[in-house]
């Protein structure tokens, strides 16, 4: 039954607009059947993840065909980047964070800086980043984790379903951010 549930949710997440009514039951069942221990799954956690579904109503947490909503996780470096890649030639919006692994499933998040990352012009890539003064503690519970799928719950109760993007390189996406 387990592999079928993973296949079902991955197939749903590859649809243009996955529906909550389809995702939530599988989300809950996988959380129950396959609990995560982040400390033992650092290799699975590391990499580029694409947000494919969220329970949030925030526009930047919705799946849009014109927007790549990526999260680059580098737990060995205690760093992460949330990256909204806008259509060319607009560049993207990035937020850099420091991570603190808190086993078994919690990751503490401290946002450091964020802003606009422009498109590349030859060797030059303009950016406008500013420091962030985080007023509240933030965290993410990684509840299910494989090398293909990550299910998480945010500190505000939001559910997130992400698929791993093996075709994207963490170094290329983060090189201009001076992590």
Language model features by range: what are they?
Residues 2-179:
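Soluble ligand-binding/transfer domains with enclosed cavities or grooves
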């Amino acid at each position: 039954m387990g592999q079928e549930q993973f296949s079902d949710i991955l197939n749903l997440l590859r649809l243009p607009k996955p529906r909550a009514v389809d995702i939530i039951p599988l989300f809950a069942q996988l959380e129950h059947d396959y609990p995560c221990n982040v400390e033992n799954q650092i290799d699975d956690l590391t990499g580029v993840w694409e947000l494919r579904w969220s329970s949030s109503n925030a526009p930047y947490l919705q799946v849009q065909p014109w927007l790549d909503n990526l999260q680059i996780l580098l737990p060995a470096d205690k760093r992460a980047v949330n990256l909204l890649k806008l259509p060319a030639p607009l560049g993207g919006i990035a937020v850099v964070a420091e991570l603190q692994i808190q086993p078994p499933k919690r990751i503490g998040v401290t946002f450091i800086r964020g802003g606009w990352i422009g498109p590349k012009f030859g060797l030059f890539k303009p950016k406008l980043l500013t420091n962030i003064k985080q007023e509240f503690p933030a965290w993410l519970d990684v509840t299910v984790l494989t090398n293909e799928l990550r299910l998480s719950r945010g500190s505000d109760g939001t559910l997130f379903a992400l698929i791993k993007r093996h075709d994207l390189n963490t170094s290329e996406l983060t090189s201009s951010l001076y992590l």
